[in-house]
């Protein structure tokens, strides 16, 4: 996990550590701190790779400017995603990128709301921050790819389908159809992000 996701995971692990201890215990936290900070190794490796390849650890920020990529408010992102889903000039790109990006948010946010009282706060906190950070990009083309790594949401979906075999079959079938459609579009040269 690199850049923001690895650092985000540190926050979630820290919240889980404090919650699992039941109280704030400085000594116990210090003993476990190396494990909590372990995801930072990925971020440091990413920065080191940037330094080795491009000469500066934060060179990726300059490279992202070429794609008009940066952080922006989630409301601004959702607004341009909605506009592009409704009226992007290339219908294939609208169907392959913008509409799925909007539908994924529409599916993931209610799932997060469902889970907020059923799961430990670490899971919902991490999932919320993950969703908001991924939808706070100035040119979001890869929401599906980003959300495919949002593991807490898969736990939430599993809890939603627990003891509901019809819903389980419906979701599994829908995901299978979605996977096949994604693969088909990819094989035909579609804009699969």
What name fits each language-model region?
Residues 47, 125-142, 176-192:
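Transmembrane-helix signature of polytopic, lipid-linked glycan biosynthesis machinery
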Residues 21-23, 72-76, 137-143, 158-164, ...:
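Juxtamembrane membrane-interface segments at transmembrane alpha-helix termini
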Residues 17-31, 157-172:
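Membrane-interface junctions at the ends of membrane-embedded or membrane-associated helices
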Residues 93, 103, 187-193:
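Long, hydrophobic alpha-helical transmembrane bundles and adjoining juxtamembrane helices/loops
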Residues 36-40, 163-191:
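Signature aromatic-anchored transmembrane alpha helix within multi-pass, membrane-resident enzymes
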Residues 114-136, 146, 170:
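Transmembrane alpha-helix segments characteristic
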Residues 2, 8, 141-161:
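Hydrophobic/aromatic-rich transmembrane helices and adjacent perimembrane loops
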Residues 2, 6, 10-108, 114, ...:
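Membrane-lumen/periplasm interface segments of specific transmembrane helices
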